[in-house]
């Protein structure tokens, strides 16, 4: 079995001949995604988002366009402008998502999955945050290690781009990648990446089972629920229901659940221990005549 066959056996691409959109930045991960998708026999269309955040960003787009031309792959360039300032990574990610099709495939690997788990742990995430990308059809390379993908790309005739910002330690993900994970591996005396990825998979199965147990709760709207009934629920069930009902948009970067502190304050409102509470996303949860109201 050659390298491409081995990586494809661990990937989760759709059936050959399927039309797919790929996010191709030109880096080794996305270039590996492109080459493997073609090896799989998919009908590929490549998308590249130019944020114009670096002086050379247009050169990157030109480089990807040349590669796509050589591979006879349709290339679509998206020009977006992201204003400098705080939370730039999140806003740039939101701009990418808005520019490309929702079903676009990305080159996230197992290493990206584990980095996301650790970042979410530091935010105090629950089940959802600790099981990212698992069974996500837009992340077909989530079971492939980054180094293996890069080795595959290095054997191709194409030169990948390297974003120098991936080495800058002022970005939290880079510190997790370059500092935290190596320390964890050293302390554990083993490679923790596949260990944490497996843990995420197991937790995902348990989360899916919990979803089945609470399926009837999904049909209960926030403002139609009777607080007297909700107050009798086990706390874990009530928290789970509130997390879904109180999720909010975060600067256009997808839907995010409320923090643990927000959920606890909402529980107090449900149980009549508080009249109202302020929540994220500029919302306020209040209780009147045994009914909840989100404004």
Predicted features by range, described:
Residues 2-29, 48-51, 80-82, 178, ...:
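AMP-forming adenylation/ATP pyrophosphatase catalytic core
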Residues 1-179:
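Core alpha/beta nucleotide-donor-binding catalytic domains of modification enzymes
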Residues 109-261:
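Flexible helical/loop "lid" subdomain adjacent to adenine-nucleotide binding pockets
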């Amino acid at each position: 079995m050659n390298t491409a066959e081995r990586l494809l056996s661990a990937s989760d691409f759709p059936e050959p001949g399927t039309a797919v959109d790929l996010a191709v930045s030109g880096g080794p991960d996305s270039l590996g995604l492109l080459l493997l998708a073609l090896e799989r026999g998919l009908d590929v269309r490549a998308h590249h988002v130019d944020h114009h955040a670096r002086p050379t960003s247009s050169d990157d787009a030109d480089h990807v366009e040349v590669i796509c031309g050589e591979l006879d792959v349709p290339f679509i360039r998206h020009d977006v402008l992201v204003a400098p300032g705080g939370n730039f990574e999140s806003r740039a990610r939101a701009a990418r998502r808005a520019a490309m099709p929702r079903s676009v495939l990305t080159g996230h690997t197992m290493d990206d999955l584990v980095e996301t788990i650790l970042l979410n742990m530091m935010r105090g995430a629950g089940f959802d945050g600790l099981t990212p990308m698992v069974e996500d059809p837009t992340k077909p390379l989530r079971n492939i290690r980054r180094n293996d993908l890069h080795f595959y790309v290095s054997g191709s005739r194409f030169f990948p781009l390297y974003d120098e910002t991936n080495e800058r330690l002022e970005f939290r993900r880079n510190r997790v990648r370059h500092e935290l994970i190596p320390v964890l591996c050293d302390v554990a005396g083993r490679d923790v990446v596949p260990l944490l990825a497996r843990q995420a998979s197991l937790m995902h199965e348990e989360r899916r089972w919990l979803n089945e147990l609470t399926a009837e709760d999904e049909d209960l709207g926030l403002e139609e629920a009777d607080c007297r009934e909700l107050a009798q629920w086990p706390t874990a069930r009530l928290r789970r229901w509130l997390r879904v009902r109180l999720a909010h948009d975060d600067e256009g970067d997808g839907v995010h659940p409320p923090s643990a502190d927000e959920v606890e304050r909402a529980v107090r409102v449900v149980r009549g221990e508080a009249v109202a509470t302020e929540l994220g996303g500029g919302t306020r949860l209040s209780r009147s005549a045994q009914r909840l109201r989100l404004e």
